Amino acid sequence: MIIFIYINMEQSQVQFSFYITYVLLMTTATVTFIEAMRTNIPNVRHIFNLETCISIIAGYFYSIFVAKINAEGSKVNWNEISQLRYIDWSITTPLMLLALCLVLANNIKEAVHLGTMAAIILLNYFMLFVGYLGETSAMSRWMSEFLGFGAFAGMFYLIYNRYVKKSIGIDNTVLFTMYFTVWSLYGGAYLLEEQNKNIMFNVLDMFAKCMIGLGLWVYYTKIVKID
């Protein structure tokens, strides 16, 4: 009886993390969409358009996750949900990287070049590919982790070398560090058991997609003054 209650409580925590992430994604999409319509600065509008797309796409997949959880009840296949995330990530992560590069490039008055962006996205897809192989047991999880972090390091090195190293001030360094930290934590969560992994992925999605999107809104609208 005690074990049954514990399992139900643990599952309720996972379900709640899905619900709250979905709500925050829809909130972020609303805020960034309104700001994209309001601003008259083209580069900022492009960034908010991307952030809106990211939140809507991720929100759509979270609606699928929530529907599966509600339909399956106590027999949720968490591993299947973990695998479905890769479809979400294959669409949203390139958009997130493009948005990051646009913000960083805009701050140093440069353009985002196709060659650099293509290399970053190819490394991103390689990282996702080996992650999926580990998720489906087609590759050992530790080998997948090692190869994935190699691609991750190469990807963020390109971003740093192109857009952060030459920047003046701390804006680009702070944003780059936030992205680097949150994205690297996905690699740690990847090694957890399924329920804890899904909770961590949900929390990290909240930061990577919601908090970053809302943070950019605060940054560009200057609604919070730093004395």
List the predicted regions and their residue ranges.
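Hydrophobic alpha-helical signal peptides and transmembrane signal-/tail-anchor segments
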Residues: 1-5
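Polytopic alpha-helical membrane-helix bundles and their juxtamembrane interface segments
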Residues: 7-87, 93-227
